[in-house]
């Protein structure tokens, strides 16, 4: 399996920024910590690093993520006034019923039937209980049960994600997701267990610091370096747990192509990221670190 999200680019850019800053250490008005965040794809890496003290003595944080698509290298996307990326609450719902032969469904408690009703009820959460003025996305990406066509199994499993762009919607919908799954299973005589696999808040950047970082990047004489404000994505990023604790900025750097090489999205096996973004990202990271320390001695 491959994550195909550009994390090799992130590591290369940060390593190069570290090399630049180490070679020019006398220019630094403070200390810089380099965070190589693991397990972003499972939303566990930042939490583990926090538990091991990654923010001890840290006053601010800056993170970049490359983006694919039909767009030129040099765009940098940010949000200084709202949610940059949505929350994500991954969940696993295990439905327990009673298996039976397919010829005698009346002697079973069919977990597949229960699962179908749970699925439909959860979809109704977004349609009828989510504030239409807020952005909420619920996806069931896995529904598995049984191994034979003529046997009703004992269990069924649904796995998915709930994403929102504000904390109030998140709190309400996570609570209702659990209630709907448990009560729907009870209605049909079964039982449900709900496990929350990932719990990541919305990523909200510090407005003043974001404006600062944009101004520092605009100081660099890099051809095509272009700001794209008010960016918001329904994807999620556990850097949000860092941003909850210290003033933070998260930006997307375009690593796309303006031809067919930009057609495949991230997480697609055919995605291509443009390596021309690497020196841009390294230069911006290093310069922003130097300038922020100068201004905040």
Region locations from a protein language model:
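A generic alpha-helix surface/boundary motif
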Residues: 12, 43-44, 179, 211
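Detector for methionine-enriched segments
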Residues: 13, 27, 35, 49, ...
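Histidine/acidic-residue-rich, glycine-tolerant segments that coordinate divalent metal ions
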Residues: 1-2, 8-9, 21, 26-153, ...
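Generic recognition of short, well-ordered alpha-helical segments
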Residues: 16, 44-47, 106, 172-175, ...
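Basic side chains
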Residues: 19-22, 33, 163, 170
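Metal-dependent amide/peptide-bond hydrolase catalytic core
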Residues: 113-297
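DPxDG-like acidic metal-binding loop motif
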Residues: 11-18
């Amino acid at each position: 399996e491959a994550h195909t999200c550009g994390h090799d680019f992130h590591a290369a850019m940060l390593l190069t920024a570290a090399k630049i800053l180490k070679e020019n250490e006398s220019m630094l008005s403070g200390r810089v910590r380099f965070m190589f965040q693991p397990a972003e794809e499972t939303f566990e890496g930042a939490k583990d690093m926090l538990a091991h003290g990654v923010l001890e003595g840290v006053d601010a944080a800056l993170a970049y993520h490359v983006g694919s698509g039909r767009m030129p290298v040099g765009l940098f996307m940010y949000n200084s006034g709202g949610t940059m990326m949505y929350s994500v609450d991954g969940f696993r719902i295990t439905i327990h019923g009673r298996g039976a032969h397919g010829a005698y469904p009346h002697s079973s408690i069919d977990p597949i039937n229960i699962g179908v009703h749970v699925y439909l009820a959860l979809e109704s959460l977004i349609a009828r209980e989510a504030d239409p003025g807020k952005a909420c996305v619920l996806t069931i990406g896995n529904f598995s049960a049984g191994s034979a066509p003529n046997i009703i199994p004992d269990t069924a499993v649904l796995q998915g994600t709930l994403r929102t762009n504000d904390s109030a919607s998140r709190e309400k919908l996570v609570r209702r997701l659990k209630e709907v799954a448990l009560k729907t299973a009870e209605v049909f005589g079964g039982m449900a267990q709900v496990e929350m696999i990932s719990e990541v808040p919305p990523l909200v950047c510090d407005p003043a610091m974001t404006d600062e970082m944009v101004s520092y990047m605009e100081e660099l004489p890099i051809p095509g370096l272009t700001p794209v404000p008010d960016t918001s994505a329904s994807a999620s990023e556990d850097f949000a747990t860092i941003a909850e604790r210290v003033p933070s900025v998260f930006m997307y750097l375009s690593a796309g192509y303006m031809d067919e090489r930009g057609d495949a999205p991230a997480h697609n096996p055919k995605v291509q990221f443009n390596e021309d973004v690497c020196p841009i990202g390294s230069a911006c990271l290093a310069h922003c670190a130097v300038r922020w320390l100068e201004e905040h001695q």
